[in-house]
Every structure is written in C-alpha cells, then in structure tokens.
Regions:
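Rieske [2Fe-2S] iron-sulfur-binding domain
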Residues: 2-100, 104-115
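C-terminal catalytic domain of Rieske-type non-heme iron oxygenases
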Residues: 88, 93-174
Length: 174
C-alpha cells in the first residue's frame, strides 16, 4: 500500500506497491474524465478514487468501482483500468518509463555506474520526510550548502556522511 505520485515530463505518475510488495506504475489519470486519482505519497492505501465521479481503482490498477454503474451499460471494467507504465525497481530506486510500451533497460542505461549505485545500499533506506520551504532568503546561500560537503561529517554523521566524502567542494570560480 505504499504509494507516491509525481509528474515527469508532463506525465502524471502513480507508483504503488501491491499485496506482494511488487511495484506498479500507472498514469495517475482516471479513465473516465481524466482527474488525478492520487495526490502526494503515503502508505496503507488499498484503493484510489477519482475525486470527480468516484471511479475506484485497486493497487494493481484494476477498475473496481463505478458509482451508478447501471448508467454505463456494458462497460468492461478490464478495459478501463489505470494505464500501466513500464517500471523497474533496482539499486533501491524505482525507474518508470512515462511513454509505454518501451521497457526500461536499466543495466544498459546505467552501464558502469550500476556498480557505484549498488555500493550505496539504497534499498536499505526509506523516505523520511518531504519539506517545501517558502521563505525569503538568498538562494546563493542555499545552493552553496549543497555544493560543499565539508559539513557532512558533523551535521549528517548518522545519515549520509558514511556514504559520501566530506572533504570535497564544488566551486564555480566566482
């Protein structure tokens, strides 16, 4: 029941784990009138419902409920599930192709970088929180924090410091 939504290249995506723990990816669009069936991320979800007319889909993308279904004489629910997107889970990441029917060849795409990604052990990590900060501040100071890693061994010693070098910096020469 863990799920997340995102927009990638203009395609609204819903990724969700089914009962077996397998990741599924779909276009986050109701097949009736095109409203999004999910927002944000979370866990424990067993179904997703369109906020407009209430069409309901399960974690495998199958259409499970249509309010006043008798008004849709002969509708085949099998043909009106969420549109499935190709998805691969590897190295602790989920890779979705927003333009089916292409299947992602992650090994070929990553090439030698796959060894580096595997060494991070990202599959052992889990999402902690998402924050959006709307504040009046000097964006250059924020960017500088992400371009220098000197602070990692102190500020992030129990999270990312063990997997990153804390004595490197990136400067643009200005």
């Amino acid at each position: 029941g863990d799920y997340m939504t995102d927009d990638f290249s203009g395609v609204p995506i819903l990724a969700v784990r089914d009962d077996g723990g397998r990741i599924n990816a779909f276009m986050n669009v109701c097949r009736h009138r095109g409203a999004r069936v999910a927002q944000g991320c979370g866990s424990g979800k067993t179904s997703f419902s369109c906020p407009y007319h209430g069409w309901t889909y399960d974690r495998t993308g199958s259409l499970r409920g249509i309010p006043y279904e008798q008004g849709f004489d002969g509708i085949d629910k099998v043909l009106h599930g969420l549109r499935r997107l190709p998805v691969v889970e590897k190295h602790g990441m989920v890779w979705v192709v927003p333009t089916p029917p292409a299947e992602p060849d992650i090994d070929r795409h990553l090439n030698a970088m796959a060894i580096d990604l595997a060494s991070f052990g990202l599959e052992k990590y889990s999402h902690y929180e998402t924050r959006v900060l709307n504040a009046r501040l000097n964006w250059k100071l924020v960017i500088d924090t992400f371009l220098e890693t000197y602070h990692l061994s102190v500020l992030h010693k129990t999270t990312i410091a063990p997997i990153l070098h804390s004595n490197l910096g990136t400067f643009d020469g200005m």
